[in-house]
Amino acid sequence: MKFVDEVTIRVEGGDGGDGCASFRREKYIPRGGPDGGDGGHGGSVWLRADEGLNTLADFRHERKFTAQRGENGMGKQRYGKSGQDREIAVPVGTLVSDADTGELIGELLEHGQRLLVARGGKGGLGNVHFKSSTNRAPRQYTPGTKADRRNLHLELRLLADVGLLGMPNAGKSTLVRAISSARPRVADYPFTTLYPNLGVVSVGAARSFVVADIPGLIEGAAEGAGLGIQFLKHLGRTRLVLHVIDAVPLDPAQDPVDDARKIVAELGRYSESLAARERWLVLNKLDLLPEEDRDAHVNDLLQRLQWGGPVYRISALSGDGTRQLAQDVMNRLEVMDEEAREAGERARREQRQEEGPE
């Protein structure tokens, strides 16, 4: 199935049914009072997050979604039946905005979460509501109100804990295969990864995280070159970025340090907040060097990069170093979770102190 991460659709709620102007017509009651019932409410359109979906491709076949109209009111004070709601399944991680105004409507971040995107109209009132001491036979009624109608822009941003960043052919997809059950396409040429891939990495009982592999970046990506820039947004919700570098490129003209600097520059041009995210350096393909040459090669790379953060030496193909990397990532994410909980508790305590005793 083709990966589709943006789409525009049309949603229309159901209009409310009209109220009814009716009078009692019974034997021996020639001039019965009003008995017109109310119209039914129109159905609304909802979006619902479904963890079983991972693309917006289904919207290629259907772009307009309409809820049911409310039925009109009837005599004998019978109310019209309300219209059925329309529910549309979307992948978890979908961002919803108004396609015409750009206004953000909401995000669907949890399985089963629902978002109202087009409210149905209200049913009109029947003439029974307009009876008064001065108007015993009102012919007034109100029509149902119109429902919301709007164009929506849906944008899928994958939910992952960890994002992989790097040049084409750096070995990101091979790393995903090495540490997870995902099986992205792997081959010895650039741009093998054409769409983002997600993998679940398990490091023990009830301990796992989600990793996202996006297409590789090239110089000029922030201006639209290559394949990766359109998928950089999928790293926006990650908490940790692994910068994968081909430490031993087969092309002698290719410089790993120059490649790394280009990636960092493109990242900064795309998003300052993403560039400031915690980033670990992962030096891949070191198994291509004789063991006695590896330390000197790594030290030279780190010195030229002026890198002072975490660094890992791995071979994604053989699996060397990948288990330790996955374990350390899991430990770091758990520390982040604990830090977030503590920060939330501090914020709640400070809020209670500001509010004072009741």
From Swiss-Prot:
Membrane-traversing stretches: none
Region (Disordered): 337-358
Record carries keyword Magnesium: yes
Organism of this sequence: Alkalilimnicola ehrlichii (strain ATCC BAA-1101 / DSM 17681 / MLHE-1)
GO biological process: one example: ribosome biogenesis
Keyword Transmembrane tagged: no
PROSITE patterns xref list: G_OBG, GTP1_OBG, OBG
One matching Pfam family: GTP1_OBG
Positions of Mg(2+) binding: S173, T193
Name recorded for this polypeptide: GTPase Obg
Recorded family membership: Belongs to the TRAFAC class OBG-HflX-like GTPase superfamily. OBG GTPase family.
Bias (Basic and acidic residues): 341-358
Single GO molecular function: GTPase activity
Gene: obg
Subunit structure of this chain's protein: Monomer.
Record-annotated Obg domain positions: 1-159
Residues the record lists as binding GTP: 166-173, 191-195, 213-216, 284-287, 315-317
Cofactor: Mg(2+)
